[in-house]
């Protein structure tokens, strides 16, 4: 089972939903980087369960413990080990699901592959695995901010069939976090919250779309062919639980345009290190390499698989059974997935920033 990601800026996550702890080993972070531990904790608080009445009622503090790699606010260049202890597990909620495969959940496929699985809390398939990613991503965000002034902003664009149209020029973290659903449109966010509450009362769930904008992206990140920047971003984001789709730039809507309509024309720039364009249908990446424009992406999340309605399924013996899930689950994963998206984008960009310096700086400088 692969639990590691990245080439130079490399993360390895560990732990399970109902185990003793979850965490991450971050290797390859440059030394002497100033790290604000509070910013790491802030990101974990944004993904923490029990933060509102539209998320899972599981109540975890998710307090970060730094075990190694950071001393007096500076990175040492050695592996950074970070840990969060699980304190509010209820494995008894899963007794009736021990050998029953939840529809559209990882239970069945894990059993087919390994012949054994940690059914309690979903094990490694649980979103608690992403705690390590978010902690490491918070370090990556500080690296990107320090060296490039890069800003990563993600927000909930759509919940179920309730969509928003956000002005990307005016988007800010303050606006995103101004409500519990993390949609920076006050009117639409109210509708989204009511829809989630309604589905929660019905024992059901919903999915939606998260949009991500990256500002102040260095040009030259990414490589041709197999290590294209958008390919690595897609892999990173599609590795998150419940993801089912990825778009960059114009995405699928670009297929309705002609080449003359879709092409991003280059224009003169005062900064010779960047290529400015009149439009951004490419989403800031061309030929697999960043051009310096904003990176714009959308990520689709399916409805939460574990719901409170009775469903038909089979057990490990292949017998048909009826099941109604217990446990504490998000009726919609998107509000808490926003910092997860931020984290994975930050990890990819930090890794490619270091790769670009390793390959090109000796010659270009």
Curated annotation (Swiss-Prot):
One of its GO terms (biological process) is aromatic amino acid family biosynthetic process. Pfam families: Chorismate_synt. PROSITE patterns: CHORISMATE_SYNTHASE_1 (PS00787), CHORISMATE_SYNTHASE_2 (PS00788). Homotetramer. Reduced FMN (FMNH(2)). This reaction introduces a second double bond into the aromatic ring system. InterPro entries: Chorismate_synth, Chorismate_synth_AroC_sf, Chorismate_synthase_CS. NADP(+) binds at residue 47. Pathway: Metabolic intermediate biosynthesis; chorismate biosynthesis; chorismate from D-erythrose 4-phosphate and phosphoenolpyruvate: step 7/7. Its cofactor is FMNH2. This is Chorismate synthase. GO terms for cellular component: cytosol. Belongs to the chorismate synthase family. Residues 266-290 are annotated as: Disordered. FMN binds at residues 124-126, 287, 302-306, 328. Keywords: Amino-acid biosynthesis, Aromatic amino acid biosynthesis, FAD, Flavoprotein, FMN, Lyase, NADP. One of its GO terms (molecular function) is FMN binding. It catalyses: 5-O-(1-carboxyvinyl)-3-phosphoshikimate = chorismate + phosphate.
